[in-house]
Amino acid sequence: QVKLTLGEIRSIQVNVMGEVVVPGTYTLSSFASVFHALYRAGGVNPIGSLRSIKVIRNGNTIADLDVYDLLMKGKMKDDIRLQDGDVILVDPYQSLVQILGKVKRPMFYEMKPTETVGTLLKYSGGFTGDAYKKALRIIRKSGREHQIYNVDEMDYSVFRVDDGDKITVDSVLQRFENRVEIRGAVYREGLYQLDGTMNTVKQLIKKAEGLRGDAFLNRAIIDRELEDLSHEVIQVDVKGLLNGTAADIPLQKNDILYIPSIHDLK
């Protein structure tokens, strides 16, 4: 026969110092880890570092915990079991930056000196679907004023962020590279793709499933946006175009073709 006797779990005393909500000496279970001690101390305060939480044992630093490893990667390699007399020291953060705009987790992040824009983008969850990914903008304090840096995509992995930086990721422009539109007396009004198989007025009318019976064939117009954002109006002989007596008209991006109804003329 084997007889087991359960004894009491041994307690240890740990000092939690520095930038925590309630610094002091805490009595913990001998199975307690660094996170248990931080929880008892109320967590890190607003100026405390989450990137470098030191465990000091017998005067030597035996672990340097980066909470981001747990939050971002699920790693807990430095959340070691504590021993009696251990000291947990939380220093003030060194670098706090803010990322705004079209990322999945826009907020403040604590960054290490060697970390880059690319690292920050990973922490923030990456771009949203409507983000402009080719470049971003950084506002940085410089003495008594600020400076703006436009960082291109190729430099994300090498451009280091600095304390106080404000990074903004813009959205893509609300413009289209290959859009045309048809309105009026056709069966399917709306937006269409300008491509190799559909790039003329006649082809657009066909794509819209043709003209309705009330379409006015003697005149239609194209509203065309020019490079200076002014507009040009082009007259279209729809009847001549369909019977082959008038040349088809090539379309350009953002053209809007209006086919009036005979009822509009009354």
Predicted segments — roles?
Residues 1-266:
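Ser/Thr/Pro/Gly-biased, low-complexity, turn-/loop-rich segments
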